[in-house]
Amino acid sequence: MLRFPTCFPSFRVVGEKQLPQEIIFLVWSPKRDLIALANTAGEVLLHRLASFHRVWSFPPNENTGKEVTCLAWRPDGKLLAFALADTKKIVLCDVEKPGSLHSFSVEAPVSCMHWMEVTVESSVLTSFYNAEDESNLLLPKLPTLPKNYSSTSKIFSEENSDEIIKLLGDVRLNILVLGGSSGFIELYAYGMFKIARVTGIAGTCLALCLSSDLKSLSVVTEVSTNGASEVSYFQLETNLLYSFLPEVTRMARKFTHISALLQYINLSLTCMCEAWEEILMQMDSRLTKFVQEKNTTTSVQDEFMHLLLWGKASAELQTLLMNQLTVKGLKKLGQSIESSYSSIQKLVISHLQSGSESLLYHLSELKGLASWKQKYEPLGLDAAGIEEAITAVGSFILKANELLQVIDSSMKNFKAFFRWLYVAMLRMTEDHVLPELNKMTQKDITFVAEFLTEHFNEAPDLYNRKGKYFNVERVGQYLKDEDDDLVSPPNTEGNQWYDFLQNSSHLKESPLLFPYYPRKSLHFVKRRMENIIDQCLQKPADVIGKSMNQAICIPLYRDTRSEDSIRRLFKFPFLWNNKTSNLHYLLFTILEDSLYKMCILRRHTDISQSVSNGLIAIKFGSFTYATTEKVRRSIYSCLDAQFYDDETVTVVLKDTVGREGRDRLLVQLPLSLVYNSEDSAEYQFTGTYSTRLDEQCSAIPTRTMHFEKHWRLLESMKAQYVAGNGFRKVSCVLSSNLRHVRVFEMDIDDEWELDESSDEEEEASNKPVKIKEEVLSESEAENQQAGAAALAPEIVIKVEKLDPELDSQSSLPLLCV
């Protein structure tokens, strides 16, 4: 007796899990057995195929955001991008560990994204791909950022790794395409720097796909009116990207280097600010109680000045020094503050200067590219704007050097102050003072007096911030993210070079000299530099974006479904680019007779070329239980579908008359049978693309498909959504409650247990069986059985015709065609 599963076992369950939070998005890695999920709690999760084991989770936070709207993998599978609606941010995350490698803000919440890789080959591109990046030879490797500061700086703090190279990935151009509300569409080279802003498209983007040959961009949008949505398909020409691909690749590579370096400089400044605030907090914590409890009207500065001049401390100051601070505590505090000062100094020397010099190098190379007007002027690259950006970077380097001099001066004063105070406290305790510590020159006294003047000057404007009683204004004023002038700018009196420049009108206006802003902070000059660089690199994005012209507009259908917007994230339509045949495919459903019928629209990526069978609808007829020779016939509605690979579509169907728990099917639909060259002339769309397709259902050719393998009944699960991965040969099915996940290996057959009498059935079941496009009637089957057996007896099997619940007992032989 044959024991058989409930359907032909083409797919094997390899993992199943009930998740605590509702899943709103899931997408397989293009290269690994990993699947990324986003849930309603704002978490991004990474799971492995084996038992659906969780690898890591990226929790929501204030910096990035809490409302994830979509996910996309970089084509090499090493980076994951996700969009956040509440902060309007895009975050790039390393697959190895949770953490933001790079993030940037966009103008509108992103509703969909697509990350593609260019597959076009040419001799110019090949030489560029193979050429070693000269910047690796000419520029020193950027120092890693210290790990003991904020988590935002950890992306550049990994030992023995180059995070910028990890961000940039392979030299081959890849583009992250973002779509959002109000026709918002932007293209980011290497997922980092904007190279195009598309205009002229109305509505909210539901899906988009940039072809791998860079010839066209497909977009599906919806425009809501009177409680319903009009869904339309657009195809835009992107010939400028295609025609200037080598130039776009070189330019984009430079853009992303510049973008990563700006982030590196920002993070270096963040670390410097944290080191500065650490000094303030440590001193403030010691002085606050003293100021609150002292009975005298003198200031902290006066108390220390009195001790310096007369060698005698007031009772309040002596209590502060001996009871709250102590000699041991002073020594520890001095070491800690000196360490913070040294950290700021080191960050300026090794990080700010290195990053700025690298930035200067890449901008200079970009200026060289812009000088080749024949190649780069059509892309909007402007040499004059880049020259202005180079000048702004030079000003930033000058300001960083100025800060370095201020830090060096403050360090001298700081060391002199703590040495003097240490000796004073030893005398108060009548401890022995070493002779070398007891010596104090007039210069040392001047340093101490300067330290007291600079750092203990109570500033009312600081009372609501850190540094109320102790401020490091000479250093801190450079790190404040404000537009105010410096409180104590550097003294330029007697500086012969400065005086010479001020008196020479020719040199003041010379493009060879970087402008100097003596009264502005480092943060101000940095912001100015960023704005100028952004403006300089914004022009190519505008030029390329305006070149993308709408070539095709096809109204698809009117959607009146009142579903939760979160659940719509999974819904049709679904776009796919076949890189081999250069075709755009669009999967969508049309409501007909209360059923959702799947339609496939395909267009050539080259707008000037046409394709046969451009629109076809699929009707699912019957499913054969090959091991029991039974047929499942019913009425099926398409719930979800995605491309598994270039040749196959994975579909989730609902049996509208099946009983609960046995009414969902997972199906693999080969496109080779949908687009059969032998009868393609019979399946031509006879309507017009200028009218909504759901109003022309009768004009859409419908092919009825009947399956004998590559399908499975999804028992005990209200399957609703599917995500397939042809590279790893897996699919993930999600239930309608968005919590129940089941993972299948799609190309592995389950083993069956057979008794001795089942040899014949086993042999028949192992024969390759094709998917039928047409079920024969009983009379046709009887007439053709003998002839078919004579011609090819191995492809004739017996099939029982049953109702949807398999109750009929009539049987007939059936020829598989």
UniProtKB/Swiss-Prot annotation:
GO terms for biological process: anaphase-promoting complex-dependent catabolic process; cell division; protein branched polyubiquitination; protein K11-linked ubiquitination; protein K48-linked ubiquitination; regulation of mitotic metaphase/anaphase transition. GO terms for cellular component: anaphase-promoting complex; nuclear periphery; nucleus. Its main location: nucleus. The modification Phosphoserine is found at S757, S758, S777, S779. There is a cross-link at K772, K798 (Glycyl lysine isopeptide (Lys-Gly) (interchain with G-Cter in SUMO2)). It is found in: Nucleus. Pfam families: ANAPC4, ANAPC4_WD40, WD40_APC4_C-half. Keywords: Cell cycle, Cell division, Isopeptide bond, Mitosis, Nucleus, Phosphoprotein, Ubl conjugation, Ubl conjugation pathway. Gene3D superfamilies: YVTN repeat-like/Quinoprotein amine dehydrogenase (2.130.10.10). Pathway: Protein modification; protein ubiquitination. The modification Phosphotyrosine is found at Y469. The mammalian APC/C is composed at least of 14 distinct subunits ANAPC1, ANAPC2, CDC27/APC3, ANAPC4, ANAPC5, CDC16/APC6, ANAPC7, CDC23/APC8, ANAPC10, ANAPC11, CDC26/APC12, ANAPC13, ANAPC15 and ANAPC16 that assemble into a complex of at least 19 chains with a combined molecular mass of around 1.2 MDa; APC/C interacts with FZR1 and FBXO5. In the context of the APC/C complex, directly interacts with UBE2S. Component of the anaphase promoting complex/cyclosome (APC/C), a cell cycle-regulated E3 ubiquitin ligase that controls progression through mitosis and the G1 phase of the cell cycle. The APC/C complex acts by mediating ubiquitination and subsequent degradation of target proteins: it mainly mediates the formation of 'Lys-11'-linked polyubiquitin chains and, to a lower extent, the formation of 'Lys-48'- and 'Lys-63'-linked polyubiquitin chains. The APC/C complex catalyzes assembly of branched 'Lys-11'-/'Lys-48'-linked branched ubiquitin chains on target proteins. Belongs to the APC4 family. This is Anaphase-promoting complex subunit 4. It comes from Pongo abelii (Sumatran orangutan). The gene is ANAPC4.
